[in-house]
Amino acid sequence: MTSIFFNRHYPTLESACERWGLEFDANAEFELVFENDILTLIKRDEPKLKGIFVDFVTGAVAHRRKFGGGRGQSIAKAVGLKQGVTPTVVDGTAGLGRDAFVLASLGCKVIMVERHPIVAALLEDGLRRGYEDTEIGDWMRERMSLFHGSSIDSLADAPQASNTEVDVVYLDPMYPHREKSALVKKEMRVFQSLVGADLDADGLLAPAMALASKRVVVKRPDYADDLDGVKPSMVIATKKNRFDVYVKAAMTA
């Protein structure tokens, strides 16, 4: 079981931790708290750092939804979004759900797979608040869902559970930053210290290719090697990252 510190006199917290199999540990490095009805992760030995939480309603993701370039964004091109085509996507490495939310806001149905129970708990809470929002709740409930389990084992399990045919598998494995830690965003540093690098990421490509009917998209830092050493069909480059696209079949309406 994953250990975490939390206030055991807070019933909502205790039930969330119980649901995700999180074990109370008075000496745990991380703590889960509710701040303004938002489930938040805090690194206990760095109290000055902001807590980590999932927010689909306000902040950066809301700004990107409104002003981020729509289907002209690189991620939209990578998954094959075009006129009349809105693929069903399994996000095999959901993290804090930001890329999944972008794709869902553009019309894709997205099943998020997250293997770390603390991150899954944060995602569930973010979905809860998103579903309740009057502006985005209706389409979020239709298009965004969460499946918890090992990314490799669960790639096929997630769509089977909802009887969904998958057009695209999207992967964004955690990759070690080559910059010195001071240059890495503090939030990302905390997040990496929680989940670690995805050292088994190369093992994701084969099951992803088996599951996707149309293509697999892998988001990588610009300096990273090809996933599992396999050359992609095409590459869409951005300022600091790239999307490696492994095409199996044409995207058709």
Swiss-Prot record:
EC number: 2.1.1.242
Domain of life: Bacteria
Gene3D superfamilies: Vaccinia Virus protein VP39, YhiQ-like domain
Subcellular localization, as worded in the UniProt entry: Cytoplasm
GO MF annotation terms: rRNA (guanine-N2-)-methyltransferase activity
Sorted UniProt keywords: Cytoplasm, Methyltransferase, rRNA processing, S-adenosyl-L-methionine, Transferase
Pfam families found in the cross-reference section: SAM_MT
Residues the record lists as binding S-adenosyl-L-methionine: R98, D99, E114, R115, S150, S151, D172
InterPro entries with a match to the protein in the record: 16SrRNA_methylTrfase_J (IPR007536), SAM-dependent_MTases_sf (IPR029063)
Major place of residence: cytoplasm
Reactions it catalyzes: guanosine(1516) in 16S rRNA + S-adenosyl-L-methionine = N(2)-methylguanosine(1516) in 16S rRNA + S-adenosyl-L-homocysteine + H(+)
Top-level EC class as recorded in UniProt: transferase
GO CC, alphabetical: cytoplasm
Assigned protein family: Belongs to the methyltransferase superfamily. RsmJ family.
Function summary: Specifically methylates the guanosine in position 1516 of 16S rRNA.
Name listed for the protein in its UniProt record: Ribosomal RNA small subunit methyltransferase J
Provenance organism: Shewanella halifaxensis (strain HAW-EB4)
